[in-house]
Amino acid sequence: MIIVTTDTIANQNIVEVKGLVTSSIVQSRNIGKDILSGLKSVIGGELKNYTQMLEDSKKAVRERLVNQAEELGANAIVGLRFELSAGQGTSELIGYGTAVVIG
């Protein structure tokens, strides 16, 4: 499955648009890790626990998008976008794109 953030794929023709694919994941944050991350944010530096949580979320959302696209009979996703929102103790990652057939 080819996945791109652009609306076209270089050297490929989109022969059919199958439709929108969307997925989201909501995760709660760990209080213990929040305390350690709070200290780290005061000192400065990467919040590795949150970075890993975000990477895991992106992977899960991508897998779900691929499954949806395959169910529609697509072999590619164009225009992939991610949106992240954080709330009180949670974060939500939404991914969406257009499932297409390239040939």
Swiss-Prot record:
Which SUPFAM superfamilies would you find in this protein's record? Answer: YbjQ-like
Q: Which Gene3D superfamilies match?
A: Hypothetical protein apc22750. Chain B
Q: Which domain of life is it from?
A: Bacteria
Which InterPro entries does its entry note?
Answer: UPF0145_dom_sf, UPF0145_YbjQ-like
By sequence similarity, the record places it as follows: Belongs to the UPF0145 family.
User: Any idea what this protein is called?
Assistant: UPF0145 protein BLi01945/BL05168
Report the source organism. Answer: Bacillus licheniformis (strain ATCC 14580 / DSM 13 / JCM 2505 / CCUG 7422 / NBRC 12200 / NCIMB 9375 / NCTC 10341 / NRRL NRS-1264 / Gibson 46)
